[in-house]
Amino acid sequence: MNKIANTEVEINIFNLLKKLWKKKFLITFVAIAFATAGLFYSLFIVTPQYTSSTRIYVINPNTPNNSITAQDLQAGSFLANDYKEIITSTDVLEKVISSEKLNYPSSQLLQKITVSILKDTRVISISVEDANPKMSQKLANSVREAAVSKIKAVTQVEDITTLEKGNLPKAPSSPNIKKNVLIGFIVGAGLSTIVLVIMGILDDRVNTEEDIEKALGLTSLGIVPDLNKL
């Protein structure tokens, strides 16, 4: 009994795959349509964003003569997480807003800032994203300056070195056009396939001789040909 059921499932899956193959041009059309929508969205709807990055290097205040050991490096990496919180603190953000005369709240500025710590180092990268490339550079440097001042005040660290000042981005960092087009293509192909599969599963029409035998539980004696096709 289970063998018969498994055979029926295999036949149904095979028939379903055949139906999908017959609809391959429709699936491709929908996928291309969604990919085109992703391209249109990336080019004409989303505002391009530019990212400027600056990096600082922080010395552990408890390190004598600025000598660095493996233990100091590990401790410094943990302290870097504290510095990350300081950089994104409200005091730092408000100072940047005041110095740059920004007309939006600190919460909005925070969304533009990304702080990352290079693994097993004391190097902290501060990136700022903005629709204006010059503004992204200006904000990155302003955040760095305000953050350095705050870190010194809170941790009593005096040795903070600027490794890189904020660069002037020449190309937008987002949107990622290729990624959006690819996502659109995959989503379009996936959605159209799912819809066709559901339609195939719900389709209980009798289309073949085998369907008639299953529906009536009788053996077919023959097929009456369509005279119009002879």
Curated annotation (Swiss-Prot):
Membrane topology listed for this record: Multi-pass membrane protein
UniProt protein name: Capsular polysaccharide biosynthesis protein CpsC
InterPro entries reported in the protein's UniProt record: Bact_polysacc_biosynth/exp, LPS_length_determ_N_term
GO cellular component terms given for this protein: plasma membrane
The protein's role, per its UniProt record: Required for CpsD phosphorylation. Involved in the regulation of capsular polysaccharide biosynthesis. May be part of a complex that directs the coordinated polymerization and export to the cell surface of the capsular polysaccharide.
Pathway per the UniProt entry: Capsule biogenesis; capsule polysaccharide biosynthesis
Keywords: Capsule biogenesis/degradation, Cell membrane, Exopolysaccharide synthesis, Membrane, Transmembrane, Transmembrane helix
Compartments where found: Cell membrane
Any Gene Ontology biological process: capsule polysaccharide biosynthetic process
Protein family: Belongs to the CpsC/CapA family.
